[in-house]
C-alpha cells in the first residue's frame, strides 16, 4: 500500500485513491442528506417507543399486583367467612342435637305415661270385670242356695222377691 503523501497514491490509476474519494463523497452525501439527524431521530423514536412500552408494562404490572393483592384479600376474607359459617353450622348442629334429644326424651316420657295410664285403665277395667263377674257369681250362688233352702222348707213370697232383687242390687 502506498503512503498517503507519496506521489504514487495521488495518481488517477491508483484504485486506493478512488476508494478514498468514494468514501469521502459517501460521507459528504450522508451528512448533506442529514442522515445522522434522521438516524438519531429514528433512534430517539425507537427509544421513546421502548420507554412507553416499559412504562405501560410497569403500569400493567402495578395493576396486576394490586389486583392480586385484592384477590388475596378477598380469598382470605372468604376463608374467614367459610370458617365462621362452619363454626356456626357446627353450633347449630349441636343445638339441634340437644333440642332433638330433649324432644325425644319428652316424647318417650309422654308415651311411657300414656302406656302406664292405659295399663292402669286396663287393670282397673279388669278388676271391675272380675268384681262384676264375682258379684254375679256370688249372686247366682246365693240365689241357688236360697232357692234350695226355700224349696226344702217352703216358700215365702217376700223371700222370693228379695232373692230376685239381690242380683240387681249387688251390681
Swiss-Prot record:
GO terms for molecular function: proton-transporting ATP synthase activity, rotational mechanism. It holds the Pfam family ATP-synt_B. It is found in: Cell inner membrane. InterPro entries: ATP_synth_b/b'su_bac/chlpt (IPR002146). GO terms for cellular component: plasma membrane; proton-transporting ATP synthase complex. The keyword Membrane applies. Its main location: membrane. F-type ATPases have 2 components, F(1) - the catalytic core - and F(0) - the membrane proton channel. F(1) has five subunits: alpha(3), beta(3), gamma(1), delta(1), epsilon(1). F(0) has three main subunits: a(1), b(2) and c(10-14). The alpha and beta chains form an alternating ring which encloses part of the gamma chain. F(1) is attached to F(0) by a central stalk formed by the gamma and epsilon chains, while a peripheral stalk is formed by the delta and b chains. F(1)F(0) ATP synthase produces ATP from ADP in the presence of a proton or sodium gradient. F-type ATPases consist of two structural domains, F(1) containing the extramembraneous catalytic core and F(0) containing the membrane proton channel, linked together by a central stalk and a peripheral stalk. During catalysis, ATP synthesis in the catalytic domain of F(1) is coupled via a rotary mechanism of the central stalk subunits to proton translocation. This is ATP synthase subunit b. It comes from Caulobacter sp. (strain K31). The lineage of its organism: Bacteria, Pseudomonadati, Pseudomonadota, Alphaproteobacteria, Caulobacterales. The gene is atpF.
Amino acid at each position: 500500500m502506498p503512503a498517503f503523501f507519496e506521489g504514487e497514491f495521488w495518481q488517477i490509476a491508483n484504485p486506493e485513491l478512488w476508494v478514498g474519494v468514494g468514501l469521502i463523497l459517501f460521507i459528504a452525501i450522508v451528512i448533506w442528506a442529514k442522515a445522522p439527524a434522521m438516524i438519531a431521530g429514528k433512534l430517539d423514536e425507537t427509544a421513546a417507543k421502548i420507554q412507553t412500552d416499559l412504562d405501560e408494562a410497569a403500569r400493567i404490572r402495578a395493576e396486576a399486583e394490586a389486583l392480586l393483592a385484592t384477590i388475596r384479600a378477598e380469598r382470605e376474607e372468604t376463608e374467614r367467612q367459610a370458617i365462621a359459617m362452619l363454626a356456626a353450622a357446627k353450633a347449630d348442629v349441636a343445638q339441634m342435637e340437644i333440642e332433638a334429644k330433649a324432644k325425644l326424651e319428652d316424647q318417650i316420657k309422654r308415651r311411657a305415661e300414656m302406656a302406664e295410664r292405659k295399663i292402669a285403665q286396663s287393670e282397673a277395667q279388669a278388676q271391675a270385670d272380675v268384681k262384676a263377674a264375682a258379684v254375679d257369681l256370688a249372686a247366682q250362688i246365693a240365689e241357688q242356695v236360697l232357692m234350695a233352702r226355700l224349696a226344702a222348707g217352703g216358700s215365702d213370697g217376700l223371700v222370693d222377691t228379695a232373692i230376685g232383687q239381690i242380683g240387681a242390687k249387688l251390681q
